[in-house]
């Protein structure tokens, strides 16, 4: 299979947004189950619209890329730069489930690491959750060479 990473074009955005919905649905299902319906609705009721905006903004930022597998959109990735700290952060990324296991995620990370280096950064970072819904992301990031982490927890309560 021929894998190619290219700058995102407008024609790829809707496919990437649909992939984001597919990829993040289990995470938001977990949030709903954990937080309960009321708290979930307060915090994440419009998660799809927020995700749509985030994906659109990231992919059209000039730092957004699409992975093509034999010409078909198979994944996306975008990053941001913190010039002051010299850190590049992978913001969002996903691989279509039908293309998983082909090394596409690793190719996207390597591609973005090169871009981040070219922009003069000395460190790359990514954030993800510690819950089971984020376990595949954690495995992918560790495989990509992210070898240090700071754990965190976010608490909520009703008032």
Task: Describe the role of every protein-language-model region.
Residues 100, 117, 142:
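Short polybasic/polar patches that bind polyanions
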Residues 87, 123-125:
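Structural preference for beta-strand elements that scaffold enzyme active sites
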Residues 103:
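Conserved G/P- and acidic residue-centered "switch" motifs that form tight phosphate/ATP-binding loops
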Residues 107-123, 147:
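Conserved acyl-CoA
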Residues 100, 125-137, 156-159:
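Conserved beta-strand-loop-alpha-helix junction that forms the acyl-donor binding cleft
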